[in-house]
Regions:
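Hydrophobic, well-structured mid-protein blocks that either form specific transmembrane helices
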Residues: 84-133
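Bacterial Sec-dependent N-terminal signal peptides
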Residues: 1-26
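Canonical positions in the second alpha-helix
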Residues: 53, 96-97, 139-140, 179
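Terminal, low-structured helical/coil segments at or just beyond the last alpha-helical repeat
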Residues: 170-174, 178-208
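A contiguous pocket-lining binding segment that forms or flanks enzyme active sites
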Residues: 125, 129-157
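Structural marker of alpha-solenoid helical repeat scaffolds
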Residues: 56, 99-100, 143, 182
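Helix-turn-helix repeat elements of alpha-solenoid scaffolds
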Residues: 35-49, 81-93, 126-134, 173-178
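Amphipathic alpha-helical repeat scaffolds of TPR domains
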Residues: 20-32, 56-78, 101-121, 147-161, ...
Length: 208
């Protein structure tokens, strides 16, 4: 009886290990594709792929996060004219991720989705989408005050805010510098996000 139980336990362990290996390989492959994706079609395909991985795994938030991130990159493209509809897709993926785990990375994407909506008409949307973007940053920083992507996004907001409203290059520069310092010292877990460092460095150069 004891040998039978040990054999069953061993089979379960081997099966779990194989499933974990397949998940890791699939994620690594598609994260690499996301890093090099340039078209809306590529990004849409990747968003769907990550969503399917998440649905298959059921307990992993990262696939849904990357689905939302792919949809977010679509939102920055000029061809994406309906920012509200795109943001709804982003937030649907984020809801799946946050049902498993709320963390700073999902709030970074939430910030970008709200920012894209706000930029449709900054003057009229600042009080709604602008506040949502700011709130997402604050929630993320409360969970992880050393997240470099959150400071990069905060610096971007300052950079694009007129000086008479508390923004400008002078205000953005030290926040970009903090972001870059945190990127340099970061030790992300396997499969965790690493994007943003080059963008932060490029923007800092514009603040000189």
């Amino acid at each position: 009886m004891q040998k039978t139980l040990l054999a069953i336990a061993l089979l379960i362990s081997v099966a779990a290990s194989a499933q974990s290996s397949r998940y890791t390989e699939a994620m690594q492959k598609n994260i690499s594709l996301l890093d090099s994706a340039k078209s809306v079609d590529q990004l849409l395909s990747l968003a769907s792929t990550f969503d399917r991985i998440g649905d298959a795994e059921k307990t992993q938030w990262l696939p849904y996060y990357y689905a939302a991130l792919a949809q977010t990159w679509i939102g920055w493209m000029p061809a994406t004219t309906d920012k509200d509809a795109n943001a709804a897709k982003i937030n649907a993926y984020l809801s799946k991720a946050e049902a498993i785990e709320k963390n700073a990375e999902t709030y970074a994407v939430e910030n970008m989705a709200a920012t894209q909506q706000m930029l449709v008409d900054p003057q009229s949307r600042w009080a709604t989408n602008g506040k949502d973007a700011s709130a997402a940053l604050q929630k993320g920083l409360a969970l992880d005050p050393n997240n470099p992507r959150l400071y990069y996004l905060q610096a971007m907001s300052l950079f694009n805010t007129p000086s008479q409203f508390g923004g400008g290059k002078d205000k953005a520069k030290p926040v970009f510098e903090k972001s870059i310092a945190l990127y340099k010292s970061a030790q992300p877990k396997p499969l965790y996000p690493t994007w943003g460092r080059k963008q932060a460095e490029d923007m800092l150069a514009q603040c000189q």
